Amino acid sequence: MPMFETTPNPNALKININHQLEVGMDYFESNNKNPDLINKLIRVEGITSVFIGPNFLTVLKKHEYEWKDIKTTIEELL
């Protein structure tokens, strides 16, 4: 199960994961060049972008969406 951390930005959520990812990539739209997981996350209603760090993802959402709804979907994808 991923570990979620709040950030100073209420529309950003840090997700700690247990495996290494390609660092420093920022994704704003789904396309065939993205990793499959990133495309799945970007397609979640309310998510606007995904940033990849060494052992974490940072997901940004539209302000009108609630994290409680988005987190459930993220957990299912991870």
What spans do the regions from the language model cover?
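Short amphipathic alpha-helix segments
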Residues: 27-43
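Short, surface-exposed charged micro-motifs
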Residues: 3-5, 48-49
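A generic structural motif
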Residues: 13-16, 55-62
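Short, surface-exposed beta-strand-loop junctions and turns on beta-sheet-rich folds
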Residues: 21-22, 57, 65-67
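Short acidic amphipathic segments
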Residues: 38-56
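Charge-rich, low-aromatic oligomerization/scaffolding segments with amphipathic character
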Residues: 64-78
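Short beta-strand-initiation
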Residues: 1, 10, 36, 44-45
